[in-house]
């Protein structure tokens, strides 16, 4: 399908949303009340919610057939998949990491992982995390692939289970306030095939990303990101960001999504395949092809003669994700928040967590060709440059180096995490676990794990007064 919608350029003025056609002639004008004390995060896709569903609301422009498709995509995202091959919610397994998109991304956020609460693979093996494994030479294990699936349908053996233990180390700020960092140690056990010797194994765990601003990220002006990479060099602070480039659908593209900017799209098709074991037109083979779980699945009645999810359904999920609104900032008139924003700049956090970017004029295109021009021409505030930065390898022995290479990203290089919506994570998902594997239990720990190119900002934060540090955290909570 290749549906093209008439292009509208949205211009946000004080209190008014005006739509113009390509000639600049005004064709629509409607009032959009901006509550006092709020700040727009994503232009016309900003929503004004401060609740457990703040990440899970459609943008204002979603209407008509797109509202219907949004609802359909929302259902496919949230509803529990089954093993039935009946063309509706079926096709799960035989091995999987999550039983729906929403199982790991509750309310389009980050489901609380079991790494802290249950020490690894939790009840029925569910961790709300992805377990990546490679040989130490970078090769994949033929019996497992890139991800260990710790869930399986009834009667089928999972590929393995995850156990995590923690090393704790106490520190102090110069003013005497204590803080603690926790380093995870990951272990795979109950391998379905031959156990892999620890000395030949790299294991990294990724907890879910917030699905905030996905449409804006897909519509972002790629040239602006490349320009940032060209001039993102601040030797006085040890900062030099670079873009990641990857090959998807046979085309070399700028990476934007994922922990290491290792994807050019929202990986809907890959998520159905790798995370849920559901075959589709892009990934028609079972994720456990060649493994014993295929035969076990057949014995349990699983069929392999049809695709488990249609391209139309996957595009509706893509539409849902790209049409979600971005929560407006809160408490922007609070004195502590205002002071905290000053501290954010004083600590040079903005050099990587870039405050303002723009989307390309014509918006984004969904996986099957539907265009979303409403996302075009917007001023957005994601607090990210979407570039790779070396985050260090020396804190507690390993820092944030996970030894996992993705495209041009080395193990110690990570995409700058967008911060929009981060202050609502506790309200939406009930926890404040941050960083790629959830090792940081709060904002302070997340900052203090910064090494490498983040070392200067960490030290500037570290040497602030407690009042200034608290105000910087108050600013982060307003995002």
Regions found by a protein language model. Give the residues of each.
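Bacterial N-terminal signal peptides
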Residues: 8-16
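Extracytoplasmic redox metalloprotein regions
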Residues: 45-69, 79-314
